[in-house]
Amino acid sequence: MFCVQCEQTIRTPAGNGCSYSQGMCGKTAETSDLQDLLIAALQGLSAWAAKAREYGIVDHYVDNFAPRAFFSTLTNVNFDSPRIVGYAREAIALREALKAQSLNADANAAVDNPMADLQLVSDDLGDLQRQAAEFTPNKDKAAIGENILGLRLLCLYGLKGAAAYMEHAHVLGQYDNDIYAQYHKIMAWLGTWPSDMNALLECSMEIGQMNFKVMSILDAGETDTYGHPTPTQVNVKATAGKCILISGHDLKDLYNLLQQTEGTGVNVYTHGEMLPAHGYPELRKFKHLVGNYGSGWQNQQVEFARFPGPIVMTSNCIIDPTVGSYDDRIWTRSIVGWPGVSHLEGDDFAPVITQAQQMAGFPFSEIEHMITVGFGRETLLGAADSLIDLVSREKLRHIFLVGGCDGARGERNYFTDFATSVPQDCLILTLACGKYRFNKLDFGDIEGLPRLIDAGQCNDAYSAIILAVTLAEKLGCGVNDLPLSLVLSWFEQKAIVILLTLLSLGVTNIVTGPTAPGFLTPDLLAVLNEKFGLRSVTTVEEDMQQLLSA
């Protein structure tokens, strides 16, 4: 086992990465190794998908399957070894079909890729785990060095984050042939074990640029389907009655669940990154979407254990449900998996609803505590002139984007302390689950404009980017000249690709934490600092002073 993709990875003087019987996320060595095997199979599939496009052969099922299966290897998504192997088998079958079609078009069709002819050696998981050793990402570290390995992983993990957003967009009916062609090209190239530093750096920026397009179509899918989010108050306390909790990012799953629970007497609560759903008109119209439950994903083993109803996981992040003994009432959807828990293959939530009706639910309603969400792209752009007016009248000094992933590390209290230390004449724009560090606090307002503005899920960084570009255009300056600072927390691969997106757009002087990615060497961090001004957090006082004086 070797996995270094998330922020909680093991760090030792000898090197970084989880490499024992189990990773810090709870992933077993078996599952981790089989995920390496799956990635190799997907690289071979992409090699032939890219080749087939040269003959005008475009298989939309392959285009959907490839990033979706890749998404299953993202942190805290799928821990179920047989399902991982199932994805690998399907990838190989799809590859062979594309290969046959390509050979029909050109008898000399061929691809130069070591993954293009991969076959699984056995049906036995142990045999497959041993085969996977051939594809562990650090297998040639001694030959290429830590810097090249780090850049490969930066590209691989960044592309994995983009694949997750591609899947979210596809669920909402969004398809862009150019994006999929670019995805297959990059995925196939990474399967050749590239070792040119400049080419890898260029690839990382290409992934960032591609992801900006992915976020654009995801934004279109969400807003075209459910309307543009508008500021909405959400209760974060319990309401009496039967209940279901839904977590993850998939708004379509939430919509289907709301439709199927309407009139049943079962209330629905959002959790984690599903919180921004309350801002969408077509979702909040359901009166039994009663509120948001819990805090950051890392607290789920305590909070889910206390929730008196079933829980549906639509995407990341799931962690071991046996710890809180709620494994008999947690349900996984789509690419999510945990051994032994119930998995919903389709869009029918009837078994979940039946279980909710059989459980006690909340016995009484707690005193309401409202927070505000729903500052989507249209709302943010509508406030642009007001922001400029406040700046011109010296009522607004600075905007801090404080957001990103949450996690268990104690150093993440930095982000709470930073948010509460922001001066009263400054605004906080936030997004993603990192907001749970401070989103239940009262930050007041500046002339009626809330000082804490929740822009949505991690992918809604797109809205923040569009706002920044709009403000810069109106003020006749560059984005980096705005009174705007980005203080980002990271945990997994979606955060990595958001960072690559920002860097590829030329955004500089971003501050990240709580730690640097374990796969980035000091040399690589120095390159990113020199080229983009990217740096790690220090202390709240030092960072605040530096950002306000920049």
Curated annotation (Swiss-Prot):
Reaction it catalyzes: A + NH4(+) + H2O = hydroxylamine + AH2 + H(+)
UniProt binding sites for hybrid [4Fe-2O-2S] cluster: 249, 273, 317, 405, 433, 458, 492, 494
Function: Catalyzes the reduction of hydroxylamine to form NH(3) and H(2)O.
Biological process annotations from GO: response to hydrogen peroxide
Protein keywords: 2Fe-2S, Cytoplasm, Iron, Iron-sulfur, Metal-binding, Oxidoreductase
Lineage, top ranks: Bacteria, Pseudomonadati, Pseudomonadota, Gammaproteobacteria, Enterobacterales
Recorded superkingdom: Bacteria
One Pfam family linked to the record: Prismane
EC number, as in UniProt: 1.7.99.1
A single Gene Ontology CC term: cytoplasm
Cofactor binding summary note: Binds 1 [2Fe-2S] cluster. Binds 1 hybrid [4Fe-2O-2S] cluster.
Residue positions, PTM Cysteine persulfide: 405
A molecular function GO annotation: metal ion binding
Protein name per the record: Hydroxylamine reductase
Major place of residence: cytoplasm
Family stated for the protein in its record: Belongs to the HCP family.
PANTHER family per the UniProt record, alphabetical: HYDROXYLAMINE REDUCTASE
Essential cofactor(s): [2Fe-2S] cluster; hybrid [4Fe-2O-2S] cluster
Organism field: Enterobacter sp. (strain 638)
Binding-site positions, [2Fe-2S] cluster: 3, 6, 18, 25
Cell location: Cytoplasm
CDD domains: HCP (cd01914)
Name of encoding gene: hcp
Top EC class for this record: oxidoreductase
